[in-house]
Amino acid sequence: LTGRTNVGKTWIGEYFATMAWNMGYKILMYSGEMSTAMVGFRFDTLNKHFSNMGLLNGSGTLGKKPDTDGAKYLQEDYEKYITQLQQKSGFIVVTPDDFEGRKPNVDEIKSLAIKHGADMIVIDQLSLMSDKRRADIPRIAYNNISEDLFLMSKELKKPVLLMAQANREAVKNRKKGESPELHDL
């Protein structure tokens, strides 16, 4: 998934991961920007429709309950949900903190995918991964990482969903009504 800044790439990627997890698939998600708590709040919003703003702000009301006449989710509903959620596993989130504060390379993600038996790997995002071949030019590094992810996907026979942020040039082009191009990564 490629898009400009703040257009919802992570939301879309995590939505796909959450839906796959609900179908019984094991997910490995690398989040290069957000903490596990932030990813978790988004998961709770996508999985059970809790208000993301309510979770972030510590609000007493956490959104409308689906299939009701306007009933609201409350803190005790969230606590009950968390207790039930602990009975199910298989959604692993890793961040740079899990790699001693640095960007992981594809081999490290692959090792975790094998270790946890992941059925789907989500990478958020390309620019927050490390190129094990250590290319100096970002475009070449991104090409190397993309190639390594493709080969990992092929070897493990598992889908990889990769988010990539378009650069500043893409933002300028947006003002002209143009879509991001591959060279805008």
Map each language-model feature to its residues.
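Residues at the beta-strand->loop junction immediately N-terminal to the Walker
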Residues: 2
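Phosphate-binding/switch region of NTP-binding enzymes
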Residues: 42, 73-76, 140-185
